[in-house]
Swiss-Prot record:
Protein name in UniProt: Nucleoprotein
Free-text comment about domains: This protein can be divided into a hydrophobic N-terminal half, and a hydrophilic and highly acidic C-terminal half. The coiled coil region is critical for homooligomerization, for the interaction with VP35 and for NP function in RNA synthesis.
Family: Belongs to the filoviruses nucleoprotein family.
Cell location: Virion; Host cytoplasm
Organism per entry: Lake Victoria marburgvirus (strain Angola/2005)
Assembly, per entry: Homooligomer. Homomultimerizes to form the nucleocapsid. Binds to viral genomic RNA. Interacts with VP35 and VP30 to form the nucleocapsid. Also interacts with VP24 and VP40.
Keyword set, alphabetical order: Capsid protein, Coiled coil, Helical capsid protein, Host cytoplasm, Host-virus interaction, Phosphoprotein, Ribonucleoprotein, RNA-binding, Viral budding, Viral budding via the host ESCRT complexes, Viral nucleoprotein, Viral release from host cell, Virion
Residues in coiled coil: 316-341, 372-399
Motif (PTAP/PSAP motif): 603-606
GO biological process entries: viral budding via host ESCRT complex; viral RNA genome packaging
InterPro entries per UniProt: Ebola_NP
Positions of the UniProt region annotated as Disordered: 423-458, 483-612
Length: 695
């Protein structure tokens, strides 16, 4: 015995076995009415159970053989199904006019009988059977991909057929619920798939509009789920006049071994004959030996070569470790193409001028094909990224925040940092609502959540170059985007002119809504800033100091809730001692160079409203977050007259634009914004809060 044959043991059946299955066929003198009632039962979502396969086969026999049982029994369809283990049991009831009358009177059919008694059927047209079968065939091309892709493909085909005037389907058939039912039936019914495929391939005469739709759908189903077979046979095992030659890129020894194994798997697949291109849809034997993962290098090279030839079907992702191999194969194939074209042009061109024209044309043709391929692939990836973002958002909203919500209170009560400056506000009886946490632990978890929302898009893929990052990020609210989205300033809340009870109810509703949607990333409540200020980010990147977060992007925490403005008292300012220079090595800033420019466009210069300009300073009670009656965010005036929005301005990892303007224009040795950016310190939340009161 050859010892190496051990590797192949168990891959081929030595005692083939076929499981026997019984299929019930219905035979009456009113076959069209029975078939229409079967269609109505399926459309109504009634589960026919083990009668489903028989009911579908009854429809096929009526449509293709006009219910002639003798013709059907001698047909290739019946022979194949018998070889596959199906046994036909015919129930005859000549006088039956209802589907109810032909159902066996057995206990396990009683729920089905009760459901059918409530079903009213008024249709008795024979053409409706072909209409239903053609509608089912629309789901075949993308059946192995999934329900969403299959339904989208079916709807596109319906639109095409309606525009061409071929056939029009009832509107209630085109609802998502009904189409999911049909998809589930087609996914589970081998008989229906097999009969549609067999007749779509072999029906050569007697076509009506429904049969042409079925043939068209079956043609699109060829090699569905067998992309590796199609690409390898077309581009790797190249057929020439002298025989089959290997592509130059797969002539190395290791890839040759994969090619040999792949040829063996193909020979096993070819035993299925005319049904081999539909092996994945029909789930035929040997299909599991044709997975991409079994031939990683061959698959990567084949996909790279196919993409170089303009195949958009090859836009699938290979394993991450073989992504670079795919890119290398793509580049090499493009160069080989140019070389072959150059050689051909040299052979067929009669003079230099013709050679130049042909070379220019082929160069343009290659570039156009390549750009079109990249455009289609980028569209596919954008669609995939949007789908991934939607799924990620749903998961995070349903699960992620529930886990971190329990830690909100505790994380805030643990901050013992002393604050020297005080704020006095009139106490109002209102429900206590703690500000949102600035907790590095929670922020790090949410960072990981957001980074996985784009996991479907391979960052190393050269074909994602045309992806519009801004578009992808806009569709996913979980991914921070400061370049493509301009924040609009929040309108100033209405002054308190109603009873305390009314304002209390509004504040409860507002804070509740904010807690419900914590991950909407400033969509509903952006920070207060002007349009011309949108280039600096509001991300809080405290996770930079944490291990393992070097490659992750900082995630915004939800902003503090905005309450209705209160009646304010005159501020009482206390001198504060500066303990830290927030501007690093910029120099001495003792002079009051931070005088705000009083213009409507400056974020630090609010409109001429005395209430809006009244300064607030934090009280010692705020250390333990007991004074929760403050407005969030607050305008804070420092001892140098600088107005900041606390905590928003000081939580930024980049200096605010108003501060940049003041330093660049008024400092005696002007510094550039780039230098200021470099000197802007990396501080924790506690340090920023401390600096905010001591500028």
């Amino acid at each position: 015995m050859d010892l190496h044959s051990l590797l192949e043991l168990g891959t081929k059946p030595t005692a083939p076995h076929v499981r026997n299955k019984k299929v019930i066929l219905f035979d009456t003198n009113h076959q069209v009415s029975i078939c229409n009632q079967i269609i109505d039962a399926i459309n109504s979502g009634i589960d026919l159970g083990d009668l489903l396969e028989g009911g579908l086969l009854t429809l096929c026999v009526e449509h293709y053989y006009n219910s002639d049982k003798d013709k059907f029994n001698t047909s290739p369809i019946a022979k194949y199904l018998r070889d596959a283990g199906y046994e036909f049991d015919v129930i005859k009831n000549a006088d039956a006019t209802r589907f109810l009358d032909v159902i066996p009177n057995e206990p396990h059919y009683s729920p089905l009988i009760l459901a059918l008694k409530t079903l009213e059927s008024t249709e008795s047209q024979r053409g409706r059977i072909g209409l239903f079968l053609s509608f089912c065939s629309l789901f075949l091309p993308k059946l192995v991909v999934g329900d969403r892709a299959s339904i989208e493909k079916a709807l596109r085909q319906v639109t095409v057929h309606q525009e061409q005037g071929i056939v029009t389907y009832p509107n209630h058939w085109l609802t998502t619920g009904h189409m999911k039912v049909i998809f589930g039936i087609l996914r589970s019914s081998f008989i229906l798939k097999f009969v549609l495929i067999h007749q779509g391939v072999n029906l050569v005469t007697g076509h009506d509009a429904y049969d042409s739709i079925i043939s068209n759908s079956v043609g699109q189903t060829r090699f569905s789920g067998l992309l590796i077979v199609k690409t390898v046979l077309e581009f790797i095992l190249q057929k020439t006049d002298s025989g089959v030659t290997l592509h130059p890129l797969v002539r190395t020894s290791k890839v040759k071994n994969e090619v040999a194994s792949f040829k063996q798997a193909l020979s096993n697949l070819a035993r299925h004959g005319e049904y081999a291109p539909f092996a994945r849809v029909l789930n035929l034997s040997g299909i599991n030996n044709l997975e991409h993962g079994l031939y990683p290098q061959l698959s990567a090279i084949a996909l790279g070569v196919a993409t170089a030839h303009g195949s958009t079907l090859a836009g699938v992702n290979v394993g991450e470790q073989y992504q670079q191999l795919r890119e290398a194969a793509h580049d090499a194939e493009v160069k080989l193409q140019r070389r072959h074209e150059h050689q051909e042009i040299q052979a067929i061109a009669e003079d230099d001028e013709e050679r130049k024209i042909l070379e220019q044309f082929h160069l343009q043709k290659t570039e156009i094909t390549h750009s079109q391929t990249l455009a289609v692939l980028s569209q596919k990836r954008e669609k995939l990224a949007r789908l991934a973002a939607e799924i990620e958002n749903n998961i995070v909203e349903d699960q992620g925040f529930k886990q971190s919500q329990n830690r909100v209170s505790q994380s805030f009560l643990n901050d013992p940092t002393p604050v020297e400056v005080t704020v006095q506000a009139r106490p109002i009886n209102r429900p206590t609502a703690l500000p949102p946490p600035v907790d590095s632990k929670i922020e790090h978890e949410s960072t990981e959540d957001s980074s996985s929302s784009s996991s479907f898009v391979d960052l190393n893929d050269p074909f994602a170059l045309l992806n519009e990052d801004e578009d992808t990020l806009d569709d996913s609210v979980m991914i921070p985007s400061t370049t493509s989205r301009e924040f609009q300033g929040i309108p100033e809340p209405p002054r308190q002119s109603q009873d305390i009870d009314n304002s209390q109810g509004k504040q409860e509703d507002e804070s509740t809504n904010l807690i419900k949607k914590p991950f909407l990333r400033y969509q509903e409540l952006p920070p207060v800033q002007e349009d011309d200020e949108s280039e600096y980010t509001t991300d809080s990147q405290e996770s930079i100091d944490q291990p393992g977060s070097d490659n992750e992007q900082g995630v915004d925490l939800p902003p503090p809730p905005l309450y209705a403005q209160e009646k304010r008292q005159d501020p009482i300012q206390h001198p504060a001692v500066s303990s830290q220079d927030p501007f690093g090595s910029i120099g001495d800033v003792n002079g009051d160079i931070l005088e705000p420019i009083r213009s409507p466009s400056s974020p630090s210069a609010p409109q001429e409203d005395t209430r809006a300009r009244e300064a607030y300073e934090l009280s010692p009670d705020f250390t333990n977050y007991e004074d929760n009656q403050q407005n969030w965010p607050q305008r804070v005036v420092t001892k140098k007259g600088r107005t900041f929005l606390y905590p928003n301005d000081l939580l930024q990892t980049n200096p605010p634009e108003s501060l940049i303007t003041a330093l660049v224009e008024e400092y005696q040795n002007p510094v550039s914004a780039k230098e200021l950016q470099a000197d802007w310190p990396d501080m924790s939340f506690d340090e920023r809060r401390h600096v905010a009161m001591n500028l």
